[in-house]
């Protein structure tokens, strides 16, 4: 899951499909979102300052990036944030890969944001991210220990 490092920092407006999707590009990190899931809970999301917003988002992407591919520099990111998902798919014609959103957010409150941008934007200090990253079997930030095993993806027989 995610965009390979060598393609992650191309110019989205000049890229070929599917990398031409600018809604999946993070201008502030000059790279693509590896996963984007946005929900609009009924009643909105309460922020710490008691204001509300309409969506709670999960945007998984590389962070801590330096360098500019547009100027020919090599881009290096301190946290690639690409989960490794291994599944046993033995009969692709009769099986499908399933993403369980409920498992992804089961320890998160979609009605209450803990600060910053609503939901998890992959930041190492974003309080809404640790449980999301745990569900994906990843560590959060550049020096974190990953949680063994992901709980979000599975294989089902058709």
Question: How should these model regions be labeled?
Answer:
Residues 1-158:
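A short, solvent-exposed, low-complexity linear motif enriched for acidic/polar residues
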